[in-house]
Structure formats: structure tokens, C-alpha cells
Amino acid sequence: MAGGRRGGRAKRRKVCYFTSNGITHIDYKDVDLLRKFISERGKILPRRVTGTSAKYQRKLTVAIKRARQMALLPYVAGE
């Protein structure tokens, strides 16, 4: 199995949610938006999963951390 994919469908390129919707500022108080980028365990989802660009992934990380600090989002998921 040296290199390449075996059968299956070709991988579709993910599009950045923020650039496609024209969002330039990510607000830490917009909890509903931030929850889309957090796993059910409370972890921040990586770029390769969400498809966000590097610029907006950095802004998203800062916004999520601020929301956690202000107790708008949990650090870990509840039971």
C-alpha cells in the first residue's frame, strides 16, 4: 500500500465558513456560532475538520478562550 487512496470518492475541499458568509469579526458573546466549532467534549475543533482558514481559526480560538474565561462556554463538557 505505497501512497495514494484506494477506491472511494475524491475528497471534497472544505470552504471557510467565515469567508463564505462574509463574517469579518468573530464576537466572543455569539455563543451559538462558537458552539459549531467545539466538539461535544468541549474541545476546539481543528482546521482540517471545520475547514476554516488559518486567519479565522486564530480569531476563533481567541474568541472561544474569551468566552470560556467569561463563563459563556464550558471548559469541558458536562456529564
Curated annotation (Swiss-Prot):
Belongs to the bacterial ribosomal protein bS18 family. Binds as a heterodimer with protein bS6 to the central domain of the 16S rRNA, where it helps stabilize the platform of the 30S subunit. GO terms for biological process: translation. Gene3D superfamilies: Ribosomal protein S18. Pfam families: Ribosomal_S18. It comes from the Bacteria. The keyword Transmembrane helix does not apply. This is Small ribosomal subunit protein bS18. It comes from Bacillus licheniformis (strain ATCC 14580 / DSM 13 / JCM 2505 / CCUG 7422 / NBRC 12200 / NCIMB 9375 / NCTC 10341 / NRRL NRS-1264 / Gibson 46). Keywords: Ribonucleoprotein, Ribosomal protein, RNA-binding, rRNA-binding. PROSITE patterns: RIBOSOMAL_S18. One of its GO terms (molecular function) is structural constituent of ribosome.
